[in-house]
């Protein structure tokens, strides 16, 4: 999962994505193909991948950057943890030490949005 176009541009240079979900478009396998799909990479823009798609053919989830919205975060995770997922799901989060990303993931883990007030507190204001 990624947030920004610049992330997508960087990722697509190093990852051979088999499927994509971004903006208003997606190319993902049909439900009938889920059983035969393995070792495939799907790049998903967090906001685009939140609702209405099923990604349970994936059991490895990587967040390249966090969203500030708990709802978007939970929806994104829910794409892999769907009915029909028969494999253990592993989630990785890229977090740069001593950055705001640590605070964002702390809020998300506490089931909260990362807010402007939290951001200002991080800045010492």
Task: Name each model-derived stretch.
Residues 28-32, 53, 68-74:
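Active-site-adjacent loop/helix micro-motif of nuclease/hydrolase catalytic cores
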Residues 11-13, 53-58, 74-75, 105-106:
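Short amphipathic alpha-helical segments
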Residues 1-4:
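Conserved RecA-like ASCE P-loop NTPase motor core of nucleic-acid helicases/translocases
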Residues 53-66, 89-93:
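A short beta-strand element within the Helicase C-terminal
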Residues 9-12, 16-49:
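Conserved helicase ATPase core of P-loop NTP-dependent helicases/translocases
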Residues 42, 61-62, 80:
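Short, well-ordered beta-strand core segments
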Residues 68-125:
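A conserved SF2-helicase RecA2
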């Amino acid at each position: 999962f990624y947030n920004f176009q610049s992330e997508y541009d960087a990722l697509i240079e190093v990852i051979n994505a088999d499927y994509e979900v971004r903006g208003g478009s997606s190319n993902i396998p049909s439900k009938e193909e889920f059983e035969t799909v393995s070792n495939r990479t799907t790049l998903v823009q967090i906001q685009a991948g939140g609702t209405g798609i099923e990604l349970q053919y994936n059991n490895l989830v990587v967040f390249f950057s966090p969203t500030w919205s708990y709802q978007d975060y939970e929806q994104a995770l829910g794409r892999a943890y769907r009915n029909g997922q028969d494999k253990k799901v592993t989630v990785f989060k890229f977090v740069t030490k001593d950055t705001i990303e640590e605070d964002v993931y702390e809020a998300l883990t506490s089931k909260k949005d990362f807010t402007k007030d939290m951001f200002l507190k991080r800045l010492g204001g």
